[in-house]
Amino acid sequence: MENIFDKAQNLKLQERLQKLNRESKPLWGKMNVCQMVKHCQKPLEVAEGKIKLRKSLLGFLFGKMAKRDFLKPGELRKNMPTVSTFKIRETPDFDSEWLSLVSIVKTFGEKGPEVIAEKEHPFFGELTDDEWGALQYKHLDHHLKQFNV
């Protein structure tokens, strides 16, 4: 399974990010490209410990099952619900948010799993380094495909 910590796969993500521009249009969903590049930073910031999410009853009850679903081979479903913390309602500046996303992705490739602040995800529960890396890759890949890159 692809992993954001794998240097070659990380470079491919960076190359795909280079193809985005403020005129990029989604193939599905409600987010515009400016919102998407900011949204994609949020799960990475959770991994880094920059965003603290509380554990929820929903995560306690369904987190392990959802983790299996997210980590299974294949693409994520389109139009999945978004955690309210990750919803971007305003239209942020594309250039600054794009630069931030590229920088974070690059850091994940350079530092590897040492960027992970806590092994326990607030929704999915305990994750290995490989699971953290695979989840981050899969989420980014999903949204890059959403914008046809």
Language-model features, listed with the residues they occupy:
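Domain-scale detector for complete catalytic domains at protein termini or as standalone homologs
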Residues: 1-3, 45, 95
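Metal-centered catalytic cores of metalloenzymes
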Residues: 2-5, 101, 149
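Acidic/histidine-rich alpha-helical segments that form the ligand environment
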Residues: 70-115
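Short, contiguous alpha-helical
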Residues: 23-71, 118-149
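Short alpha-helical hairpin
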Residues: 10-13, 112-119
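Active-site rim elements
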Residues: 1, 24-25, 87-92, 128-130
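Membrane-proximal intrinsically disordered regions of secretory-pathway and membrane-system proteins
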Residues: 6-7, 103-104, 137
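Long, hydrophobic N-terminal alpha-helical segment
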Residues: 1-35, 39
